[in-house]
Each structure stands twice: as C-alpha cells, then as structure tokens.
Amino acid sequence: MSSPWKTSQSSVPMPEMIVKIVGSKHFRYFIEKPMNKQNEKLKTEPQTSLQKPRNDYSRRVSRDLPGPTDSSEQQITANPAEKEESKHQRSSLKPESNQKFLTRVFSNRFLDGRISYEANVHCSSVPTGDQSLSYMHSLPRRKSVGWCLEHTAKDSSGQAEEIVQRPSVMTREDSFLTTLVRRELNSRPLSSNLLDKLQKELKTLDPISSGFLHQSQLSCLFLRHKVPLPLLTVKLLCQRFSRRCSPEMVNYGEVLCFLKEATKDNLQQNGTAGYSNSRKTSSPSYHKQSIPPQDSSLLSEVNKSLLEILKMALRPCQGKLSIDCLNMSFRKEDHSFSGCLPLPKVISICSKHGLYVTMTLLETLLHHQELGYRGEIKWKNFVKWLNRASADLSCDMPAGKNKKETQGDLVDIPERPQRKTEHVKTPEENLQTKNPTTMTSAPEDPVTFFKNRPVSQPVEHLAVKKDGQSELWIDRFRKLENALYLCDLSNTGVLERERARRLIHNYNLIYSLSLSPRRINQALQRYRSGENIILEPALQYLKEL
C-alpha cells in the first residue's frame, strides 16, 4: 500500500478511519493528510496541535463529542482561560498520548460523519455471500419508526419515562413487530433452556444490574446462541425497547419478556393445531367419539354419498375386479412412495383392472379429505374405500339366484354365452310375464330371434339391453361416459367429433338412454373445439335432461 502521507502546500488535515474485513479478521487503521509544517510540530510539540488554523475544525468536532472521562480528553472550547488550562495539561502529556487523543477526536469523522461516536463502530466477521452489511453493528441515529414509537408511548402514558415502554393499547408498530417475530419463530421456536441461558449471560454482561445493555452486545449474544431472528428484526426490537435519552442502550429484560410471550403464543397455536390433527388422524374405531354429534352426522352423510359414488362405479365390474391386484398395481406405480398418484395414472390403472372411472368422478373424490391431497389421489385410502363399497354392494344384492349368478361369474368366466342367456331369463322371471312360451321359444327359434332384432343392433347386445331396462338410467349413462373416456387414449379430455357422434348414437340405442338426436347434435355443436369435442361439458349437457 502506498504511503498515506502526502504533503502539499494547501492541504488541510482530514484524518479518516478505515476498517477492512479480510476473512474472519478486521483491520482498523487511520489515513491522515497533515499540513506540511504543522505535522512535524505535532510530533514534537503537543501544544501546537491545536493552533489557530485548526481551532474552527476542532471546535466543530467538540460539539459532537460526549463528555470525556479522562482529564487528557477535555473538551476543546473557545474560552481563552480554559484554552490555557488545557494547553498546560496537554504539555505534560507524551506525544504518543496526544497523538492517540487526536486520533480519537478525528475518528469521529469516520464515514463522512455518518457515525458520530467512536464507540459506535463495532465490526464483526461477515459470512461468505452476505452482502447486506447487517453484521456491521453501529448505533444509528434515531429513525422515524423509533421516534414514532417513543411519542406514541409518551402520549399513552402521559409522563416522561426513562424507557420507551409498551403502551397498554397495542399500536400498529407493536402489532407488526409481534406478528413478525411470531412468524419467524414459527418454524424454530425458542426453547426454555435457551431463554434461561440468554438471561444468565445478559446478567453477566450487566454487572451493575442497570437493566440496559449496548445494542451491539445484545446482537452479538443472539448471534452466538443462534437465535433464529434476522438482524433486521433484532434491530427493530432494540429500537422498540431502547432508552429514551440514549437510544443505543436497550432494556434487555423487556426484550426477553417479549420473546417469551411470542414463543408461548407459538407453542399454544402449534399445540392446538397438533391436537386437532391428532384427533383427525385417530383410528377409525374412535373417530366418531372424538367429533361432536353435528359434525358426525355431517361426516356420515359425506361418507354415505362417497360410498354411493364408489358403488355406482363398481356395479359394472362386480365380481370381476380384484382389489388386491389393484392395490399391487398402485404400489408399483408409486415410485416416490408418497402414497399419492395423479388422476390420469389412477384412471389408466383402474381401466387395466376393469374398473372404469371418469375424470369427473375422481375430481369429486378430490374434495374428500381422506382421498385428495394437492390435486392427487391418496391411493391407499382409495383402495380402502373401494373395499368398503364392494362389501356394501355385495350385502345389498338379494339372496338366491343372484348370488348363484355372481358365483357362476367368478368361476365360469370363459363361458360368456351361457352367462348371457341366464341374464336373459332372470328379468323375465322377475317380471312374471303372462306368456311364458315366448320366453322358452326365443332361444329355440333362431329365425324369429333374428327377425325381432333391429338391424342397427348386434346380437350380442340384446341381453344387455333387456338387463339395462332394470338398471337405473344414471348407471347406463355412466357406461356411455366410460366408453367415451376409454376412446381418449391420451387422457386429454378431447375426442374426435364424428367418432364421438357415432359412439353416442350407438350407445344411446344399446343402453336405451332415450337421448334425442337433436339434443345430441346440440351438445356436439355447443362444445366443439375445431374438429374435436370436449367430453366433460358435452356429457354433462346430455345428462341434464
């Protein structure tokens, strides 16, 4: 580094204090531009350091200095009598001490007068990447926020106090500070052990038990104990509980009480939230006991509607769906082991096992708290609810021939023509038609069988049509929805318009949906997108008869 001493004829001494932070160390040194002749006199004759060219500057400096504690650091005044006394005292000092005094005097002009006291400069090492300069602790002048808080406290109390205490009515600044501290302590609340350690060390740092500490001491203590508060929040706390006459001194007892209250509020909120969550996640056997009667009735209604929806989806594949195999497929597809799967994945897995669910059905299930999570389906709970719906569906089926038919379906799955003839007979027996001869002659006379069949309807769907008359209309319409969604292989929710028209007309005849051609054309025209049709609104329009 080049020598800082540069002599010039018109140079005025302007000492500057430079602080450099290198790694974990900080270096402090002074740079001064002395006058050409008076600098030599400064080293040899201490009394000439305060000659006339520098009287105005030193007088201006003395206004900013606090009262000295040492006799060698008396204030510089313009009174001649006091000036001679000060000269007499300074003449007895060594040149080194006088140079130190001058260095302290002129260090008050550090950083162009931004910091007015030498004791204010307090440096710490800065972590890597921290560009906020928040680790350089200094005592700034009172800002508008501090003065606003002080005047608010003064007006509410009606008397001048030594400390800016919290008013009885919480002000806007107090509520903001409370909210800020609670939010920052929400993730990492302060433990009671840490608060006790802080209180002991604060009392150690205050040997005279004045109740006040320097702001930099409090900040360094918080940093050493890793208190999870940013330095900006610590600074706001120090401003809030600072002394009125000296803003750099902070009432640490008030700060600790404030932190204890914020931590207590956070613990209470987290405790109530955890208690409510534990009640929600309790076992199903005790779930009804932990809810009030009104909530239990509402929950039972929701569960009943959910079971009805799942039973409606299970009816077409009753006896063919293996829920254990479905569970294994879900487990294989859950690569992240999160217990959740997206809706298109759930649709594709269910369709592989013969369970046809629509996007609308899954979106309805998302609103249930046990099945939906962030737009995905909790497949484990979904399988549990399918088990319950399947058990209820098997209990709802009447005893007798229907049970035998379901057992025959489970055993004799390859014999599809025989199963279909049985389904032809069952509705006829239940309806008890007047002429049973036609029922027995229908399979025996193939000529009349084909004559009575419409041209647009294939042979294999006659049984389905007769059986469909005993089903609900919404169940038959659900089959139309499943067929259209299965044709959408890419799960885009869009199908080719002409293909959708053919499918809707065909399934309208097969399942006797009684949809008018005019309404079908209106749905296709209203919800078309270019050459395609959007399935969900079109099907909803057809459903609203």
Swiss-Prot record:
Biased composition (Basic and acidic residues): 34-44, 53-63, 415-428
Organism annotation: Mus musculus
Domain of life (superkingdom): Eukaryota
Protein name as catalogued: Uncharacterized protein C1orf87 homolog
Disulfide bond sites: none
Pfam families: DUF5580 (PF17743), DUF5580_C (PF20743), DUF5580_M (PF20742)
Region Disordered: start-end pairs: 34-98, 269-296, 415-444
Polar residues bias: start-end ranges: 69-78, 429-441
